Amino acid sequence: MAVALTLNDLRKRQAPDGSIDVVIETLVQSNPILEDVRWAEGNLPTGNQTTQRNGLPEVHLRQINRGVPVGKSSTKQVTDTCCLMESRSEVDVELVSLAPDKEAFRTSEDMAFVEAMGEAVAHHMFYGNSAKNLDEFNGLGIRYNKYGGKKHDASYQVINAGGTGKGKLSSAFLVGWGDRAVTGIYPKYGYAGLKRQDLGEVDAIDANGYKFRALSTLFKWKPGLAVKDPEMVAAVRNIDLGAVNAAAATVEQKKAVVDAMIRAQGRMRNLNTVHPVWY
């Protein structure tokens, strides 16, 4: 996998005229997670294939004139796909003509679409589920939805906070962003981040099927998520928000959530090699 870059890194590499700045700033302001994500080019036209080590070889103590068994590690391959997100802005040319600063007016209209795209990507990072919708990529919620597994399994990284279905349940995720850990991905030979294309003046169609002239902008993003090392994510699931946020919540109840987060963080290794963030 290629070296992963943040959106701010990409800002420095694209559009010397600064036209990309306003897009990136809007994305980051609408969802801070988009500033944390490292984006890397996948090794497939549709995403990325990662080889994960899921077992270590045994180590033996050797005696003089005696050998040891041959050992080996075990691995598995995981394929992560990118999805295709698109949206179009169409602003009536007559409406634009009324604005004192036409370009600024059109940009302000477009930024609503930029913010919506950012929210969609951030949502999929946690809640995407390809089993329910093949067009989505799997988010952290579906990848870490079980607990109690063996070490090196994703389920081992999950701590159960003990909440039940009676109240509103939530989760907390600790993500270690990094080249060899967790990254956002885009297709091989593709582009990172949101692409905004000015389509110029086109025929738009109203609700009755009638045409009018409009200035159109196409927004496109092909994001995905790759968890190269499952131990670079930890989660606390089934947090009872009613018990924690309620006025009657006890110190012990709040402390239990903090203790669960500390336990979860303890299951991540080499935190100094990644950019860890709680969500």
Indicate where each model-derived feature is located.
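N-terminal low-complexity, intrinsically disordered segments
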Residues: 45-76
